[in-house]
Amino acid sequence: MNEAKSALVVAHRGFRGIVPENTLLAAEKGLAAGTDMWELDVAASRDGVLVVLHDDTLVRTTDAKARFPTRSPWTVYDFDLAELKTLDSGSWYAKADPFGQIKAGKVGPKELETFVGLRIPTLEEALDFTKRSGWKVNVEIKDATGMACDPWIVEKTVELIARFGMAETTLVSSFNHDYLRRVRKADPRIELGALVEEAPADPVALLKELGARSYNPGLKKLEKSTVEAVRAAGFDVFIWTVNEEKDMRRVLEWGATGLFTDFPDRFLRVLGR
């Protein structure tokens, strides 16, 4: 895995470059592209159901503001699942054109029609799709510190992964490293990924302390020497979020285990797959 031209392709929130993120359609497109795994984000509804959503609020990727005008600031944790399931989590893509793919002619009217009315998946639905597809997933648990779900979001996530028999095919990551300690305690079989915004003084020591398998840093401030040191110590390095082919080639040469990308087709092309 640490050879110069081999690395895992991770569809970041699904194939979100061309499909609304964190939807089952984004997952389907990522799978069809030939990726090794996909990454999703876990939050929770007010009534205790784990759902797949990146932001703390529903404003950017749903029509919650129009549908529930009095519920500002539209925090996902303040809505019951039944309410979340009424939201359109696909139409926003056409208005925002987040990666300029509509303007570039890469996403056309027919594709945009299929985005209308997409729903926020539950984690159960996402894991079910992954399991049935014989695929792998990186479950990122969003930091819910201060929210009602904080005491149980980790344990419920682990419980669901175990129920699907996916403890050994799922990587669980979080920027909240205490969550990773809780995952390890709840089910030691699950591999852990330590997400970091800022590089710790000693990444290898951090991984050992957490019992983590992989170091998951952002690309912007990452140095080649860090990747090499972590890999030499026997750990994996998954880098987020790498969308330009020149950057893909660069970190591939550094020995990255895998890359999170919004455009997995580009990375697959770089790899010659």
Outline where the language-model segments fall:
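Phosphate-group recognition and catalysis centered on beta-loop-alpha active-site segments
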Residues: 1-273
